[in-house]
UniProtKB/Swiss-Prot annotation:
Name assigned to this protein: Putative pre-16S rRNA nuclease
EC number(s) from the headed UniProt entry: 3.1.-.-
UniProt keyword annotation of Membrane present: no
GO-annotated molecular function: nuclease activity
Localization in the cell: Cytoplasm
Function: Could be a nuclease involved in processing of the 5'-end of pre-16S rRNA.
SUPFAM superfamilies for this protein: Ribonuclease H-like (SSF53098)
Protein family per UniProt: Belongs to the YqgF nuclease family.
One Pfam family of this chain: RuvX
Gene Ontology process terms (BP): rRNA 5'-end processing
InterPro entries: RNaseH-like_sf (IPR012337), YqgF (IPR005227), YqgF/RNaseH-like_dom (IPR006641), YqgF/RNaseH-like_dom_sf (IPR037027)
GO cellular component, as recorded: cytosol
HAMAP family in UniProt: Nuclease_YqgF
Length: 161
């Protein structure tokens, strides 16, 4: 498993592979999966966190089922740009999951992704109880969509250059 940068995504993907977006919480792991054209992110059901090994195995099973070639994981940087304890927890999670997969990971600044997801769910009139169950996957979809949009720009620049 490697940590790569967004500009190296395309070189790591095989034909028809997708990209996963992850929002790592203390109780759940929000998941979103791209389409094969790497244009749209689609939220998936969250993983209810139990023990690291069980969480990792569930995640790897999803990666295999969804033909994931790269994973984008939200990095919860503080609003002032500093790294808090959640940043270290996320980095440790990625380091530990290396025992289970060779899929490369990209850290992606997730500032305001949960707020954006909450606003979106409110705008489409999702009830409070359903919002609680969907917020982490909606945040994962926002994280992934930001990365997919960046990949599209990089692709355009590559074909124009």
């Amino acid at each position: 498993m490697a940590i790569i940068t967004i500009d190296r995504v395309i070189s790591h993907l095989l034909s028809k592979q997708t990209i996963a977006g992850l929002d790592l919480g203390t109780k759940t792991i929000g998941i979103a999966i791209s389409d094969i054209s790497l244009t749209f992110s689609n939220p998936r059901p969250v993983i209810q966190r139990k023990k690291f090994t069980l969480d990792a195995l569930k995640l790897i099973k999803i990666f295999d089922h969804e033909n994931v070639g790269v994973a984008i994981i939200g990095l919860p940087i503080n609003m002032d740009g500093s790294n808090g304890p959640r940043v270290q927890a996320t980095r440790t999670f990625v380091s530990n999951i290396a025992m289970y997969t060779k899929i490369p990971f990209i850290f992606w600044d997730e500032r305001l992704s949960t707020i954006a997801a909450q606003r979106h769910l409110l705008e489409i009139d999702v009830s409070r109880i359903k919002r609680e169950n969907r917020i982490d996957s909606a945040a994962a979809a926002f994280i992934l969509q930001g990365a997919l949009d960046r990949i599209q720009i990089l692709r355009q620049n590559h074909t124009e250059g």
